[in-house]
A protein has these predicted regions:
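C-terminal, well-structured catalytic/ligand-binding subdomain of enzymes
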Residues: 1, 5-7, 14-134
């Protein structure tokens, strides 16, 4: 349903506001939505987003700090795990790339297609992983 809406309509946010969305289904397919920019459907082993645009990186490049390589770092770590990747591995990556301070990461999510569940951590408290089962 969401994919059909995206094909028929342009999704936008209010002026001077931006946000990405990642939607996933029980088959592990993901849809990355960047309002005003576009969308991408992923069917690989993982899908990854960060604070800057994945679909049009040049649009957010002026706002990215030179040392902010979290997307690239997480992508490399994901590739190292290969076929042996668990929810705990995902959280170890998220912990390695989380932000602290004024722009601290507030929520980190991991969706397990195998379990049809979303795991989450709030405010970088990686010692307390919550779980929501569908």
């Amino acid at each position: 349903d969401v994919l059909q809406i995206l094909k028929e309509r342009k999704i936008v946010y209010a002026a001077d506001a931006t946000m990405q969305a990642m939607l996933s289904d029980k088959h592990g397919r993901t849809l990355v939505v960047e309002p005003g920019i576009g969308w991408r459907e992923d069917e690989g082993r993982y899908s990854l987003i960060t604070n800057y645009s994945i679909l049009a990186p040049e649009s957010t490049r002026p706002f990215v700090m030179p040392e902010d390589d979290r997307y690239e770092k997480a992508s490399k770590m994901l590739n190292i795990y290969g076929n042996h990747f668990t929810v705990n591995n995902a959280f170890s990556i998220l912990q390695a790339v989380c932000q602290e301070g004024i722009w601290a990461t507030r929520v980190s999510f991991v969706y397990s297609a195998e379990e049809n569940a979303v795991y989450y951590v709030q405010n970088n408290n990686f010692s307390q992983i919550g779980k929501y089962e569908f």
